Amino acid sequence: MPGMRLVCRLAHGHFPRKGQRRRSLTVWKAETSRADCLGAPNIRTAPLGRSEKRTAICFSTGAQDSSQRAPFRLQNPGQLLQLGMHSLHLHPELPTTDPAFFCKLHFIKGNDPYCLTISHVKSVLTFS
């Protein structure tokens, strides 16, 4: 299976419940190594605003279908209860400059469902 490295420009997050304030996140790096696109991405997020705290979200899945929910590995297991990966479109035959990557991560932080969408990719840097 090919490995790949992705650099993401932008992501948006929001709380879908009524009365919840919309929050934004910047995803500055997402990559997989020695795995296919459903392997074990490591996605780092940095909240917008004054806080410089960054959170690393690591998850893995053996699912053949990206619409299936993925289990996750995290240093603090109580932080995230569920994590899913959807609509991942990236093929090793694509040109390395083609920003053909889109995925939506659904997870629960505390009792609030949270949706994070990675919507833009700067470039696909490497395939191996």
Swiss-Prot record:
Tissue: High expression in pituitary gland and weak in pancreas.
Protein name per its UniProtKB record: Putative uncharacterized protein encoded by MIR7-3HG
Organism from which the protein derives: Homo sapiens
Gene name of the encoded protein: MIR7-3HG
